[in-house]
Amino acid sequence: MDSSAATLTNKPIFVVGSPRSGTSILTWCLGQHPNMLVIPESAWMGDFAIDLAIRYQIGTARGNRSVLSAMDIEREEFFARFGQSINDLILNHRKDLERKRSGYAARAVPNAMPEASMTVQPGVNRKARWVDGTPEYSLHICGLRKLFPGALFIHIVRDVDSVVRSILNFDRLGEGSLVANEQEAYNYWLRTVSSCLLAERAYGPRVVFRLRYSALVDTPEAALRSLFNFLSEPFAAECLTPLQKRINSSNVRDDFKIGDPETDPSLVEQAMRLSTEVEKTPQPPEASPGASDEMEAAFNKRISEYCNAQQVIAALQKRAERLAKEIKGKRAIIQHLRARRQRYKLRRWCFGQDSDKHRNGWWSALRESFRRPTRKS
């Protein structure tokens, strides 16, 4: 644990966008910066924000008879306190993370990360900001903003055809494909990119920065200089190093074609239209209150869906417990009836009508054997 920093900056950076859009390579570019620490994809903070919202509802449900509302703890403060704790934990343990990275990943996962990112850089404990490149956070930007009000988001966007081809050819470190088919790949791109574009409109260019994948590949230095200007950080030439080596490559064959006849044509058309629009139109110059309200409504809807799902799960668990108890009781009854049947059969054999016939027949045969005349010699 690193407790050397008296004041810990709470300005994390989230790299969002569709999977296979360059989120990994951009994240590791940022990790070369002397003030930025790359953390492994976390994947839990989005759902954590939703769970916090549910807990806040519970903690304020009875007005002044509930602790949070009785103590005038506002929702924004509730979220931000937890976010600050997460930030402090990450920064206080940055030295431990870099120590573990000093060699194991480069050997265990070839080509997964640039080697420069796996070594302990001088002054690592002075890195005051952390970077998370979890693509799924494209769908959780509103909740992450509540946890980390000072967070900045980089939306890296790539044309949909390239993403779909890459997704269909990518095996996630031996864990299988990201999607089952082409239809899911188009839908995944559409959902994540649409969510990021809504965040661009909702929060404006001071919070969300759009970076085209093509710009990162074709003019990397210019692209990173613009990006660091957005992040209010000085440009660091070492951040270009990871771009010299392909990482997390899906190794798409040149002759690989997309165009599955089972894929919904209207979905493909919608994705293609949005992809062209993103490539040709600039990012909105300012935040939109209407889009922000839309983000908030979507977040609240998700909270409601989670609450309903939890209620259904709780009801199913109670039903399962009740059925298990009923089954246990019926098994006991069956065992009792089987035991009674065995006792009944035993009594009937020993004392019943059948047993009398059996015993009388035996005695008659015995008496008859004594009455038979003996043969005279």
Residues of each region from the PLM?
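PAPS-dependent sulfotransferase catalytic domain
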Residues: 51-62, 111, 117-238, 252-261
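Short gly/pro/ser/thr-enriched loop/turn and capping motifs at secondary-structure boundaries
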Residues: 44-47, 161-164, 242-244
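PAPS-dependent sulfation machinery
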Residues: 37-138, 173-174, 267-271, 277-287
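ATP-binding Walker
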Residues: 21
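P-loop (Walker A) phosphate-binding loop of NTP-binding proteins
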Residues: 18
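PAPS-dependent sulfotransferases, especially Golgi type II membrane carbohydrate sulfotransferases
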Residues: 1-13, 200-201, 229-376
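A conserved segment at the C-terminal end of the G1
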Residues: 24-36
